[in-house]
């Protein structure tokens, strides 16, 4: 005899508060664990954190901050193609081993031109070149600081005598020595014919020493990804982002297991075979295999777990996050396709669980939305500082460009949009560096308890299912908290 349970219920759905990791024999100290992992098939991370492609989470400032900590940010798409490409370019220029395409100014230009370029690119010096890109000199803000004639030719104020340069084979250690010996901050790199081929700055060398865990490409630039939707101009947007230097493209939709998304994935892989394409969001192993078979370089897992997402309530659809992550992890065995666990993370312990269930890394939104580097508006409420945070399925975000993520791109009337998210505020949390420090600390601690020296070893950890009483027991209880911890707040605070 058939029944609803026998015929319709195909799996138990568990999420973070339903389970705990079982401690195991360990020879691993938290400070010695290895956090290296992968974001996508060809992109490694030094910490398993990815900031979400949300318009109140990740623009260039956030992407720079998370990359310096060892993760990667995904620039959101709720802006014009030009502006999104510019945000990517800002990240790629933020740090360099050697700047391979430095901003230059041609001889004959004026002081006003140089000042405008310095303001636009936030730089303090510009190499001066002729029409054939021969290095003629360098102009810095020191040269221009007291110059009153804005129409004066740059040739008259630039430094050109005794100009210190180096060749392409110079490593950063040797470059640092040259900079120190000559008391200069910028070192032009030229070829044998005197053509400018790059620029090494003292600031970049200092940053590299200060942030040895930073996530960088083979040229020493910070890595960054960028989100796109499934629209008529997706390939045009991708082209602009790739040209700007994006290390990966994330096809970001509410339902990645759909024909339109898979067709766009195929187009993207055909048009950009040398760049990693990440696709999401999904919640089943079947979806993961289909995306992997069609060329996805990573998949993003999570339908409805986010704090600002209402998909499960509005549409009645989703899979509790830990079950979804494990189902996808099992399906991807043998494919070399990493899994990004996206959403539902409130504490560092949730991150440990998400990775133990099969995640290669986690995508974070609310955990960093309250930081200094997030683009959300700062709000003062009842004497406390907050930052705005909204789901990309909220009415406000959909009005600004995320309608296509929820397959409503053709809906012109705002009143006819069906949102799958809300807008709100989160407490101000300080800097990204401070937040990531605590999250990394919690992850290291969890790995130590499980005896897992690496992310891959953490995948072998076992869980125990708990009751509501177990959840209550897990949190501080029978006490009034008088001093807040930087990594804990009560549920629903």
Where are these regions (language model features)?
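Short beta-strand/loop segments at the ligand-binding rim of alpha/beta enzyme cores
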Residues: 44-51, 97-102, 161, 217-227, ...
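Active-site-adjacent beta->alpha loops and helix N-cap segments on the catalytic face
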Residues: 31, 80-89, 147-151, 195-215, ...
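Catalytic beta/alpha-barrel core
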Residues: 74-78, 104-105, 125-127, 165-166, ...
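Glycine-rich phosphate-binding active-site loops on the catalytic face of alpha/beta enzymes
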Residues: 68-83, 246-258, 297-315, 345-379
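Catalytic cores of alpha/beta
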Residues: 61-64, 236-244, 277, 283-301, ...
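Bateman/CBS regulatory modules and CBS-like beta-alpha motifs in cytosolic regions of diverse proteins
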Residues: 33-45, 52-54, 83-121, 128-130, ...
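Alpha/beta catalytic cores of nucleotide-metabolism and tRNA/nucleoside-modifying enzymes
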Residues: 1-25, 105-106, 167, 227, ...
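Short beta->alpha transition motifs characteristic of CBS
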Residues: 75-80, 123, 127, 134-150, ...
């Amino acid at each position: 005899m058939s029944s609803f349970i026998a015929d319709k219920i195909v799996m138990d759905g568990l999420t973070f508060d339903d389970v705990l990791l079982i401690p195991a024999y360990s020879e691993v100290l938290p400070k010695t664990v290895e956090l290296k992992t992968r974001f996508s098939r060809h992109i490694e991370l030094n910490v398993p954190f990815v900031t979400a492609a949300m318009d109140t989470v990740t623009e260039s400032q956030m992407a720079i901050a998370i990359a310096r900590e060892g993760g990667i940010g995904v620039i959101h798409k709720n802006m014009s193609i030009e502006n999104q490409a510019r945000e990517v370019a800002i990240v790629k220029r933020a740090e360099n081993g050697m700047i391979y395409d430095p901003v230059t100014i041609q001889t004959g230009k004026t002081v006003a031109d140089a000042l405008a370029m310095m303001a636009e690119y936030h730089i303090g010096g510009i190499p001066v070149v002729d029409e054939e890109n021969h290095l003629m000199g360098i102009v810095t803000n020191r040269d221009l600081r007291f110059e009153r004639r804005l129409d004066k030719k740059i040739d008259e104020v630039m430094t050109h005598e005794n100009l210190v340069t180096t060749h392409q084979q110079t490593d950063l250690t040797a470059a640092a020595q040259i900079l120190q010996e000559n008391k200069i901050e910028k070192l032009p790199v030229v070829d044998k014919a005197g053509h400018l081929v790059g620029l090494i700055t003292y600031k970049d060398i200092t940053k590299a020493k200060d942030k040895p865990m930073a996530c960088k490409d083979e040229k020493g630039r910070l890595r960054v990804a960028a989100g796109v939707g499934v629209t008529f101009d997706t390939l045009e947007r991708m082209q602009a982002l790739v040209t700007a230097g994006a290390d990966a493209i994330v096809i970001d939709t509410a339902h990645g297991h759909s024909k339109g998304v898979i067709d766009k994935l195929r187009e993207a892989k055909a048009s950009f075979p040398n760049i990693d394409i990440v696709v999401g969001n999904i919640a089943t192993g079947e979806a993961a295999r289909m995306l992997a078979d069609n060329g996805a370089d990573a998949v993003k897992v999570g339908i409805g777990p986010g704090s600002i997402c209402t998909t499960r309530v509005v549409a009645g659809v989703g899979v509790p996050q830990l079950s979804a992550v494990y189902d996808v992890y099992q399906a991807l065995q043998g494919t070399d396709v990493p899994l990004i666990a996206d959403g539902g993370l409130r504490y560092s312990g949730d991150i440990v669980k998400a990775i133990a269930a099969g995640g290669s890394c986690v995508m974070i939104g609310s955990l960093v939305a309250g930081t200094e580097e997030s683009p959300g508006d700062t709000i003062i409420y009842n004497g406390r500082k907050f930052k705005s945070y909204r789901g990309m399925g909220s009415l406000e975000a959909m009005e600004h460009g995320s309608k296509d993520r929820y397959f409503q791109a053709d809906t012109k009337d705002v009143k006819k949009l069906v949102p799958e998210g809300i807008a709100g505020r989160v407490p101000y949390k300080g800097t990204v560096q401070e937040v990531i420090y605590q999250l990394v600390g919690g992850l290291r601690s969890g790995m130590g308890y499980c005896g897992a020296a690496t992310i891959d070893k953490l995948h072998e950890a076992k869980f125990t299912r708990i009751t509501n009483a177990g959840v209550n027991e897990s949190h501080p209880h029978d006490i009034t908290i008088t001093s807040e911890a930087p990594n804990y707040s009560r549920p629903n605070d």
